[in-house]
């Protein structure tokens, strides 16, 4: 039936849409041909929704956008693609991919936002510990899950991303990492059950016990094996407040040693949130000292820095959860007991107390500012990597202190994670050596007035960093990976490539799903 719509919607403009209407072919008819209850958008309307992403460096023309009512509509779109010779299907959450991963040129894009409210139910796992969970739609935004869980049940998911304007299915298809991951692992380690539409068009419930191969394939699977329509996410009691702290270091070795000590402690012997970032040793308002203070009344005093410090500095970012019923003295003692072990620069400590939900939504204000000044709509050539503890010192000396010593016009995150909190049965790949590895995120923002050449230079610098890693044998993996050839993907997955290929053969043998990742080509 998909052949029915192709002749009428190959041209992505109003003229083609008018011609189709004149011929008596409407989008209602297309919906019927796909056997779905939801809406179909074609032509310019489809391109407006699914032709660009947050990265802003790719622009493609999908054949149509499917706005499903539920999983059966998604399965219908996949089955229609299977009946065609060349159509592909991509799931699009909130469009936050960087390199076109959620796009389908000439294919069908499934707009998961229309399913956001299909599931929301809190329950408890069977067993003695009464662990709470919430069933949510794959198209739900994490910020909405947070607000509803806390306001209605006093509960919250355990593991987060920094920015919560992302869909549940989107982050679970990658990993989902923030400052809680050292304790609970990524978001992929905090789900117990999924509903998935596979590349065969099947709607399948899966877990560690039931259809386990699909379950672990989809988690971190880059959308290659199925589209997540429901996830069962583990919950815990939500705290009321967070003590948010930043402390500054001049020496990378001391910064990393303190961070590694914190993430290696047992729950009550550490903070609840541990992250870190690099910033420029200067007054640049976007890249330098002003990015560190947490409150308008705070001021970064550069006279506290030794004259010997280098071009970049380092900041540990910490969070401690507490209840309204906890006394200030109790919280202060817990903080001082932990802070007292750290070797940051005296006088460069900043802290505020704020509600738990506000802390988790802290990036929301940055989003609002970026939308006001236009940088939310400009390209975002971001680079995210996992780097082993063994090589993070070399990475600092070459990348932080040389290649990006003037900043990237956005945050430069670096903080440790623990291998033991990640499940190697999932499709996520991390560095090969050691218990501790680091996430590095160069989150570049482009000024609205910037020339195309400046974006190209940023992309070239990202490539230079990756090439340096390869040339020097750095134990690294791209997070939110983007490659253009299968040879690069084979190198990325290493000895897990054969498992990845086998899983593809099981759950999407025609390579229908997620063509924007550029891992497999559509099979006839």
From Swiss-Prot:
Tissue expr: Expressed in the vasculature of roots, hypocotyls, cotyledons and leaves of young seedlings. In flowers, expressed in the transmitting tissue of the gynoecium prior to pollination. Expressed in the mature embryo sac with maximum activity in the egg cell and the synergids.
Looking up Gene3D superfamilies in the UniProt record yields: 3.30.465.10, FAD-linked oxidases, C-terminal domain, Uridine Diphospho-n-acetylenolpyruvylglucosamine Reductase, domain 2
User: Per its UniProt entry, what is the enzyme's top EC class, as one word?
Assistant: oxidoreductase
Per the record, a Pfam family?
FAD_binding_4
Q: Which residues carry this modification: Pros-8alpha-FAD histidine?
A: 96
What Enzyme Commission number(s) appear in the record? Answer: 1.5.99.12
A GO CC term assigned to this protein in UniProt: cytosol
Does the keyword field hold Flavoprotein? Answer: yes
Q: Which PANTHER family match?
A: CYTOKININ DEHYDROGENASE 7, GULONOLACTONE OXIDASE
User: What is this protein identified as?
Assistant: Cytokinin dehydrogenase 7
What is the organism field in this record?
Arabidopsis thaliana (Mouse-ear cress)
């Amino acid at each position: 039936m998909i052949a029915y719509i192709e002749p009428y919607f190959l041209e992505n403009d109003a003229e083609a849409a008018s011609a189709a209407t004149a011929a008596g072919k409407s989008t209602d008819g297309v919906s019927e041909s796909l056997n779905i209850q939801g809406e179909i958008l074609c032509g310019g309307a489809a391109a407006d929704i699914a032709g660009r992403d947050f990265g802003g460096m790719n622009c493609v023309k999908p054949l149509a956008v499917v706005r499903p009512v539920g999983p059966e509509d998604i399965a219908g779109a996949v089955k229609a693609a299977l009946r065609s010779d060349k159509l592909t299907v991509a799931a699009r959450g909130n469009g936050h991919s960087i390199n076109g991963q959620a796009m389908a040129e000439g294919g069908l894009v499934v707009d998961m936002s229309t399913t956001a409210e299909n599931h929301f139910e809190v329950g408890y796992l069977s067993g003695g510990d009464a662990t709470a969970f919430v069933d949510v739609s794959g198209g739900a935004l994490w910020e909405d899950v947070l607000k509803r869980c806390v306001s209605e049940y006093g509960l919250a998911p355990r593991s987060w991303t920094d920015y919560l304007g992302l869909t549940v299915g989107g982050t679970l298809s990658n990993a989902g990492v923030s400052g809680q991951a050292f304790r609970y692992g990524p978001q992929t380690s905090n789900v117990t059950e999924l509903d998935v539409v596979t590349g065969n068009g099947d709607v399948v419930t899966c877990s560690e016990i039931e259809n386990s191969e699909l379950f672990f394939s989809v988690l971190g699977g880059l959308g290659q094996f199925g589209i997540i329509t429901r996830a069962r996410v583990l919950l815990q009691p939500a705290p009321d407040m967070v003590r948010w702290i930043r402390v500054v270091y001049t020496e990378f070795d001391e910064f990393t040693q303190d961070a590694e000590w914190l993430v290696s402690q047992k729950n009550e012997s550490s903070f609840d949130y541990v992250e870190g970032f690099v910033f420029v040793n200067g007054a640049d308002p976007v890249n330098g000292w002003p990015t560190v203070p947490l409150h308008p009344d705070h001021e970064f005093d550069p006279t506290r820095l030794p004259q010997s410090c280098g071009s970049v500095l380092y900041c540990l970012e910490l969070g401690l959860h507490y209840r309204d019923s906890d006394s200030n003295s109790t919280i202060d003692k817990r903080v001082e007991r932990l802070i007292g072990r750290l070797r940051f620069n005296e006088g460069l400590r900043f802290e505020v107390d704020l509600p738990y939900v506000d802390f988790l939504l802290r990036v929301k204000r940055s989003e609002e500012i970026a939308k006001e000044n236009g940088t939310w709509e400009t390209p975002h050539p971001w680079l995210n990597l996992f780097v082993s503890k063994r090589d993070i010192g070399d990475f600092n000396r070459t990348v932080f202190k040389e290649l990006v010593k003037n900043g990237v016009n956005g945050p430069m995150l670096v903080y440790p994670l623990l291998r033991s909190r990640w499940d190697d049965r999932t499709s996520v790949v991390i560095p090969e050596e050691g218990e501790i590895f680091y996430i590095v995120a160069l989150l570049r923002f482009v000024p609205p007035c910037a020339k195309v050449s400046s974006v190209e230079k940023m992309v070239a610098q990202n490539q230079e960093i990756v090439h340096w890693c390869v040339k020097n044998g750095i134990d690294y993996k791209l997070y939110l990976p983007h490659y253009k050839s299968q040879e690069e993907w084979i190198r990325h997955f290493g000895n897990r490539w054969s498992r990845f290929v086998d899983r593809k053969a099981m759950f999407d043998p025609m390579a229908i799903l997620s063509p924007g990742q550029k891992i497999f080509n559509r099979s006839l």
